[in-house]
Design a protein with these regions (language model features):
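Short beta-strand/loop segments at the ligand-binding rim of alpha/beta enzyme cores
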Residues: 17-24
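Short acidic loop-to-helix transition motifs that present clustered carboxylates
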Residues: 29-30, 219
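PLD-like (HKD) phosphodiesterase/transphosphatidyltransferase domain
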Residues: 1-3
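A charged, aromatic-enriched C-terminal amphipathic alpha-helix characteristic of glycosyltransferases
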Residues: 215, 225-246
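Active-site donor-binding loop signature of nucleotide-sugar glycosyltransferases
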Residues: 25, 73, 214-216
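Nucleotide-sugar donor-binding catalytic core of glycosyltransferases
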Residues: 5-15, 30-37, 41-206
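C-terminal helix of von Willebrand factor
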Residues: 58-59, 222-228
């Protein structure tokens, strides 16, 4: 039995069985006590899969006693892109879900200087986000996966950051894995402007080739000016995604 596990040591003990192969999604264990609990919790499993290459390499380096393998996160082939795929873009930027604070500040500054910028932003309402365009037009709550993907598909540019970048998340213990949103941006034909710290996971997903990495506002502005006016290279995106479908 295959089982996804979001948080390895916060999950129930029910996955520690000889007939279960668990796959760890968010692996943030670094402390000795956390690691010992992780080993104990899955010591009966014949194989333990680690989605993050960064976390997998870390476990190999400390001689993890479990039988571990790297199984990267992927995206469904129902969204497959080919050389003839076309994208109808409506907005320069669509910001979905939780955002990196630096990229959000950069976009705010950019839109003040370039008042023709079109973008979508979200406001938290309870456990969900409600989305609005730059004029304040209410676009609704994107309550389904397809709503989410359809809105993202209308964006020319995606702003992406790994979870711990710029103190975005403090629970990752320094791990900065690539999240599914990166592949979602690619499969929806978005240019990606990114902030990340290079590690084995960002290398695995080739962020250096598939995104424009920025540090300063000036770099952000230059990237926005360029990418707002360009279509993505669908052939290159299609070739890249063939390595990352489920």
């Amino acid at each position: 039995t295959f089982a996804y596990v979001m948080l390895p040591i916060a999950s129930p003990h029910g996955n520690n069985k000889k007939n279960i192969i668990p796959c760890m999604i968010d692996f943030y264990c670094r402390e000795k006590s956390e690691l010992q609990l992780f080993y104990k919790r899955y010591n009966k499993c014949p194989l333990v899969l680690i989605s993050s290459k960064e976390a997998y390499d870390f476990l190999v380096s400390i001689k993890c006693p479990l039988n571990i393998k790297h199984l990267p996160l992927s995206i469904s082939d129902k969204y497959r892109v080919n050389n003839k795929t076309t994208f109808n873009k409506r907005f320069d930027v669509v910001m979905l879900g939780r955002q990196n604070i630096v990229l959000q500040k950069f976009l705010n500054r950019y839109s003040e200087r370039h008042n023709d910028t079109t973008y979508v932003y979200g406001k938290k309402e309870g456990r969900n986000f409600r989305y609005f365009d730059q004029s304040g037009l209410d676009l609704g709550c994107m309550s389904t996966r397809e709503d989410y993907m359809n809105l993202m598909r209308q964006s020319r540019i995606g702003l992406y950051a790994t979870p711990a970048m710029d103190s975005g998340r403090t629970d990752t213990n320094g791990f900065n894995q690539v999240t599914p949103r990166f592949l979602e941006y690619i499969v929806n034909g978005c240019h990606v402007i990114a902030r990340y710290s290079q590690n084995p996971d960002t290398d695995f997903y080739e962020l250096d080739k598939m995104s424009t990495r920025i540090e300063t506002y000036e770099q952000f502005e230059k990237a926005m000016d360029k990418l707002r006016c360009e279509d993505v290279d669908v052939s290159r995106y299609s070739q890249y995604l063939e390595k990352h479908y489920t």
